[in-house]
Amino acid sequence: MKKNTDSEMDQRLGYKFLVPDPKAGVFYRPLHFQYVSYSNFILHRLHEILTVKRPLLSFKNNTERIMIEISNVKVTPPDYSPIIASIKGKSYDALATFTVNIFKEVMTKEGISITKISSYEGKDSHLIKIPLLIGYGNKNPLDTAKYLVPNVIGGVFINKQSVEKVGINLVEKITTWPKFRVVKPNSFTFSFSSVSPPNVLPTRYRHYKISLDISQLEASNISSTKTFITVNIVLLSQYLSRVSLEFIRRSLSYDMPPEVVYLVNAIIDSAKRLTESITDFNIDTYINDLVEAEHIKQKSQLTINEFKYEMLHNFLPHMNYTPDQLKGFYMISLLRKFLYCIYHTSRYPDRDSMVCHRILTYGKYFETLAHDELENYIGNIRNDIMNNHKNRGTYAVNIHVLTTPGLNHAFSSLLSGKFKKSDGSYRTHPHYSWMQNISIPRSVGFYPDQVKISKMFSVRKYHPSQYLYFCSSDVPERGPQVGLVSQLSVLSSITNILTSEYLDLEKKICEYIRSYYKDDISYFETGFPITIENALVASLNPNMICDFVTDFRRRKRMGFFGNLEVGITLVRDHMNEIRINIGAGRLVRPFLVVDNGELMMDVCPELESRLDDMTFSDIQKEFPHVIEMVDIEQFTFSNVCESVQKFRMMSKDERKQYDLCDFPAEFRDGYVASSLVGINHNSGPRAILGCAQAKQAISCLSSDIRNKIDNGIHLMYPERPIVISKALETSKIAANCFGQHVTIALMSYKGINQEDGIIIKKQFIQRGGLDIVTAKKHQVEIPLENFNNKERDRSNAYSKLESNGLVRLNAFLESGDAMARNISSRTLEDDFARDNQISFDVSEKYTDMYKSRVERVQVELTDKVKVRVLTMKERRPILGDKFTTRTSQKGTVAYIADETELPYDENGITPDVIINSTSIFSRKTISMLIEVILTAAYSTKPYNNKGENRPVCFPSSNETSIDAYMQFAKQCYEYSNPKLSEEELSDKIFCEKILYDPETDKPYESKVFFGPIYYLRLRHLTQDKATVRCRGKKTKLIRQANEGRKRGGGIKFGEMERDCLIAHGAANTITEVLKDSEEDYQDVYICENCGDIAAQIKSINTCLRCSKLNLSPLLTKIDTTHVSKVFLTQMNARGVKVKLDFERRPPSFYKPLDKVDLKPSFLV
């Protein structure tokens, strides 16, 4: 549309990030972080977790130990491809095997003697089956030689029965910043977690809480359940750091507001009073006494010295190999944050802030489960050894315990939505469309219990920390997930790092920090603490912090540390800390670098000329200071300019205040929002609704839908959209299509297309317009004897079955047809019966409203016969089906009109779809009109000057004015037809045409907006929604219809449906629908004295309550539903008396007649 000028350099750089980067191993950018995460797990982390050598049991002062060693971990890929797995209905799993050795070590004078107890060399093909993540082009990390299918982006797991599963990324519960909480007025807590580094296995977790009550400052304690003593936080800091209380006072008071300094003095004075209250106070003796008291309280089997070492050595596991003095200074820095947060809570990251959280990707899920299940496996072996020693006196292990690691069940539960046993479930989805396949693996959500904690019934807002890193449009608009599940923006990704890379990076950073003068990094009293993954390593001179951070960022961008995704955050605002983050699970995205008030993109004149031939990794290598990868914590505490345009309008002094500059607005949207057009030109709610509808659009899948027995709806004749964004193109959503182009007219049509109603042309449907095919899986399990039984009486339900008892291929199934033979037989205990065998049909019937063709049948013979049938049905648009544009103009088919009924233009062209014109004004979707204008302009000039097809770029969010798009359309029409008059040119630009009435052949008085647009068909189909039926299955207890369409049932008729049918006649309709439809009803007798239901004894109805009191009951017959009788009977059985009372009226037959005066009127 416009030439690539210098002002668009930021947009071109952003596009470079989205496209594939083979030099960096990036072949599909949207899901690259998921592929890397899973690849790290299965190629590296799984070996680290399963390779174990540790003691199980120890005896005789640790001179005898039972050891376990797991080695020779091998992971083997499957022999077949993902498509073969789908066809066979198998899961696509890798096989992991290992060797377990259990032996006894005895320490003797000669040395250590080893006695073998048990050994198992795992070669079982079902030992550990790990679901394989299918990546771009059907690749997997174990076998990259599988044949490539370029349009298969993957990102899925194939579960059994060929169901492709994807899941969202959960936010970790553990926060990287302590959680501040106000317990009650003047009472506060500061909770934080400490997790051991990734190289320490098994992972150790500790959770601590610092409590502070203004009325009891002496009780300002730190505690941890069963893992640490409860001790005064100031005294613990003094004990660990070996400094005086005055040192701690100065450290806490430095650069603090007066109110915080006052509280610091009060806390230090309270600690002094505590020490003065103890005679001959000694800090070591004080801590030792607390440890001894805790040892007695816990009744620990360890000696006091072992107990103390275990408690203090494991204090703060994330600083496992750090001296106690640094641990003490770390506690002082935490206390400093705590005291500041009491007075300035709003300046501290709250618990919902993404600054505090890491994110679990696919690889991390499997890693966590593998770690937990391995500990359970080792625990089971230990318990089995102890039981055998106790019962038999021998150290032995049952082979069953060795061969059941338990990982298979955990991984299977993961794909069904169950992450951990204690954490509830998280969201997983079957893979249906391209949009879901990309959006769901990039969704980030909180744990289910975090949803409950976060006040799920209150309105949740878009958290400020999610700005730029999350899509502000693609969020749930209603329900408990509002604000709790978000979509990553197109530039955002999640970091991954190997354990070896982590250790090397940590070592390089520490060496860089220690390269500074020793005194400058030892300012522990008034300096800025430097932490690496929350582990304190130094304290920097306050006069050097700016130079340090600037130099660190420059070295990082130049590749000095070997990792471009390191995050360095300078926390000012009196909290005074430099935080360096290198771990996995951090949100990162690129930003344009501002250095000393200059946009580094502008000071590289060679960049523009070379940009077209470079990849993103090339830019990072050859122009390292132009772009920086920034994590969400660094972004939050940095000054970031909103756009390049605003930055260039500032003065030089204002520019120096900024550290980074953002890319254009289109890069802040997610991939679903990028499939929309011009959401910034519409009203706000249209973007949220548009994202929800785009994910419901029916697309064309690339996988083999005819052989794969799975549910799905697929577009038969998809078209690539003409108006697209760069993200839509690079993600291959555009190439794989999710709609068709149709010609629309914005006008009213005989009052039929009111509100959301649309008119659709009959001939358009007959030509395959927006035609779909529905693939549906039917599965039944039949006992083997029932399947082998022969039917005695010919049944119409078996008319589509072959002699083998299975439905025929290409048979058209109707409602009531059986898909496999299932005949139950029973023997009557009657000696006089000639044939005491009776049989009846119990087969599962086809229940859909529409006919379907049988495409494929699979049978598995075990103890039961498992039959799976795939049916296909072409489904053209019918009344009630839903459609939408990419601007959230959803419509429902109100009328299917013949071509002769529709208005036409001067060329005889009739619209495919007629949409109510008032919807544009009510919903304020101006970008829908722009899309029609741009699509029509493309049809005039579809090729550029080089003869190449060029789609029109209309990003979801953009700063381009509407006039620029109108100018583009004008140039297209002037190029193709330069002789147009001004009026004709204006009509073509704005897609205004004169239409003719089909009945009178006269033109309409006003022009009609008439042009092409990309139209989507939604998954909401009329025949799938039909749940009100007059016959079907019923429950055994209450004999009402089953609830749920999938179970062959219906819906219960409620008050809203009742209100809709009042016009039909309230009394008759309610009686028919609520009572007379098919629900069993019966006559019952009610006692008018006590209101009980009469009992029937020897065919005589009597009231038990009244008969015991020798009363003469009056029984009245009423007509009620069976479920009402069941309800009253069950309530009576639970001791609740429900009395049925009657309305008392005088009998109308015996009412006295009105007196009639028969006198002549003239005598009155």
From Swiss-Prot:
Gene Ontology molecular-function annotations: DNA binding; DNA-directed RNA polymerase activity; metal ion binding; ribonucleoside binding
Keyword match Nucleotide-binding: no
Documented EC number(s): 2.7.7.6
Assigned keywords, A-Z: DNA-directed RNA polymerase, Metal-binding, Nucleotidyltransferase, Phosphoprotein, Transcription, Transferase, Virion
Catalytic activity: RNA(n) + a ribonucleoside 5'-triphosphate = RNA(n+1) + diphosphate
Chief place where the protein resides: virion
Cellular component terms per the entry's GO annotation: DNA-directed RNA polymerase complex; virion component
GO biological process, one term: DNA-templated transcription
Localization, UniProt: Virion
UniProt xrefs under PROSITE patterns: RNA_POL_BETA
This protein's record includes keyword Transferase: yes
Pfam families associated with the record: RNA_pol_Rpb2_3, RNA_pol_Rpb2_5, RNA_pol_Rpb2_6, RNA_pol_Rpb2_7, rpo132
InterPro entries associated with the record: DNA-dir_RNA_pol_su2, DNA-dir_RNAP_su2_dom, DNA-dir_RNAP_su2_hyb_sf, RNA_pol_132_poxvirus, RNA_pol_bsu_CS, RNA_pol_Rpb2_3, RNA_pol_Rpb2_5, RNA_pol_Rpb2_7
EC main group: transferase
Function: Part of the DNA-dependent RNA polymerase which catalyzes the transcription of viral DNA into RNA using the four ribonucleoside triphosphates as substrates. Responsible for the transcription of early, intermediate and late genes. DNA-dependent RNA polymerase associates with the early transcription factor (ETF), itself composed of OPG118 and OPG133, thereby allowing the early genes transcription. Late transcription, and probably also intermediate transcription, require newly synthesized RNA polymerase.
PANTHER family assigned: DNA-DIRECTED RNA POLYMERASE I SUBUNIT 2 (PTHR20856)
Stated family: Belongs to the RNA polymerase beta chain family.
Assembly with partners or alone: The DNA-dependent RNA polymerase used for intermediate and late genes expression consists of eight subunits 147 kDa, 133 kDa, 35 kDa, 30 kDa, 22 kDa, 19 kDa, 18 kDa and 7 kDa totalling more than 500 kDa in mass. The same holoenzyme, with the addition of the transcription-specificity factor RAP94, is used for early gene expression.
Protein name (Swiss-Prot/TrEMBL): DNA-directed RNA polymerase
Gene it is expressed from: OPG151
